[in-house]
C-alpha cells in the first residue's frame, strides 16, 4: 500500500513521510537494501528536514549493520549532507559495526572486522574492547596461539574492565601450552588485579608453579621468596614455595639450611610436600648417625596416617636399614617383606628397593 502511494503521489505533502515509513517497513521485513534506497530518496527529496535527519540515521545504521562504515561516509559526502566525519566519529562507528557482527555470533566475519578496526585505529577509543572480542573469536575458533597473542596485547595495556578476565584466561592458556615464562608473568599480574583473597591465592599458586616448571633454580628461589612475602599468597603457594626452596638447598649440598624448612613442613603430612619433608628429616637424622632418633621419627610419621604411601614406605625401608645396622636381620627382613607384600603400586621403585634389601641380607 505504501509503495503504491509513493509511486503514484510524488508531489503529495505526505510523500516524504510515506517514503520514510516504507523504508522502515522494508527494514523490519529484513530487506535493508530496499530500506536504504527509500531513506536515500527521503534525504534527496527533503534535505535538511527532520524526516531527512531520521532517514540519514537509518542509512547509517544499515551501513553499520553491514560492517561498511566507510560506505556510509562515502554516501554522506556524495549526497552533500552534514554529518560528523571526524576521526572520533569514524572510530566509534567502525567499532560499532564490528561489535554488531561479533554479537551476531558470526565469529569469522567478526574477526576480520575487529582486525580491520584495530589496524585502522591503532590508538582507537575501543581498542580494549576490540582486543577482548577478538581474543574471544580466536578462542571460539580454537586458535590458541592467536588467542594468546591477542590476550597478551590486551594484558600489556593499562588496567581496564577486562584485565582480570584477560589475565585469568591468558595464564591458563599459556600454562597448558607449556609456555611457563608467559604463564608466570600472567599469573603474577593476575594476583594484583583480582578482588578476593581466594583469587589472589590461586594466582600466587599458579605463578609459583609456572616459575618452578621453567626449571631454573635461581628463578625458583627468587619466586619462592616473593611468594612467601605476598600477604594473600595462601597456604598452598606458601607451602610449595618453602618446599621448593628446601629441595634446591638439599640438592645443592646445603642440607643444614634445608633441614629447618623440612622440619616445619613435616608438621602436616597430609600434603605431598609435608610427607616428603617428614622423610627428608628422617633421612638427614639417620645420615647424621642418630639411628634412635630416626626410629622415633619413623614411628611418629607412620602414626600420623599420611595418605602418601610412597614416603611412608620409604620411611619403613629406612627403618629396615636401622634394624640391619643393628644386625637384627630378622626384624630387618620382616620390615622389608611387609613392604613387598603390602605396598602398591608395584612399579614405582619401592617394591624393587625392598626386594634388593632382602637380597642384600642373604649375602
What residues fall within each predicted segment?
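Acidic, polar-rich low-complexity tracts and alpha-helical solenoid repeat scaffolds
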Residues: 1-363
Amino acid at each position: 500500500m505504501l509503495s503504491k502511494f509513493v509511486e503514484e503521489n510524488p508531489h503529495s505533502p505526505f510523500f516524504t513521510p510515506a517514503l520514510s515509513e516504507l523504508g522502515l517497513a522494508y527494514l523490519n521485513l529484513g530487506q535493508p537494501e530496499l530500506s536504504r534506497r527509500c531513506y536515500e530518496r527521503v534525504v534527496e527529496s527533503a534535505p535538511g528536514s527532520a524526516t531527512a535527519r531520521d532517514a540519514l540515521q537509518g542509512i547509517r545504521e544499515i551501513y553499520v549493520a553491514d560492517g561498511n562504515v566507510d560506505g556510509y561516509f562515502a554516501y554522506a559526502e556524495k549526497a552533500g549532507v552534514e554529518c560528523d566525519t571526524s576521526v572520533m566519529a569514524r572510530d566509534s562507528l567502525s567499532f560499532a559495526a564490528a561489535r554488531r557482527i561479533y554479537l551476531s555470533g558470526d565469529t569469522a566475519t567478526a574477526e576480520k572486522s575487529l582486525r580491520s578496526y584495530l589496524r585502522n585505529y591503532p590508538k582507537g577509543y575501543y581498542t580494549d574492547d576490540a582486543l577482548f572480542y577478538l581474543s574471544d573469536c580466536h578462542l571460539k575458533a580454537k586458535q590458541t596461539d592467536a588467542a594468546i597473542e591477542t590476550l597478551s596485547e590486551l594484558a600489556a595495556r593499562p588496567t581496564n574492565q577486562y584485565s582480570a578476565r584477560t589475565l585469568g584466561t591468558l595464564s591458563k592458556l599459556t600454562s597448558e601450552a607449556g609456555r611457563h615464562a608467559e604463564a608466570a608473568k600472567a599469573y603474577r599480574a593476575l594476583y594484583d588485579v583480582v578482588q578476593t583473597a581466594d583469587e589472589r591465592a590461586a594466582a600466587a599458586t599458579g605463578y609459583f608453579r609456572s616459575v618452578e616448571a621453567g626449571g631454573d633454580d635461581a628463578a625458583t628461589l627468587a619466586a619462592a621468596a616473593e611468594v612467601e612475602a605476598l600477604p594473600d599468597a595462601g597456604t598452598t603457594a606458601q607451602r610449595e614455595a618453602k618446599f621448593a626452596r628446601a629441595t634446591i638447598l638439599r640438592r645443592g649440598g646445603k642440607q643444614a639450611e634445608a633441614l629447618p624448612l623440612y622440619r616445619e613442613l613435616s608438621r602436616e603430612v597430609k600434603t605431598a610436600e609435608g610427607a616428603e619433608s617428614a622423610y627428608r628429616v628422617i633421612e638427614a637424622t639417620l645420615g647424621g648417625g642418630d639411628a634412635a632418633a630416626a626410629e622415633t621419627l619413623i614411628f611418629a610419621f607412620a602414626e600420623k596416617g599420611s595418605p602418601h604411601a610412597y614416603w611412608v614406605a620409604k620411611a619403613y625401608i629406612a627403618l629396615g636399614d636401622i634394624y640391619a645396622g643393628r644386625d637384627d636381620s630378622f626384624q630387618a627382613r620382616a620390615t622389608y617383606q611387609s613392604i613387598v607384600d603390602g605396598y602398591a603400586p608395584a612399579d614405582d621403585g619401592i617394591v624393587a628397593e625392598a626386594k634388593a634389601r632382602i637380597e642384600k641380607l642373604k649375602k
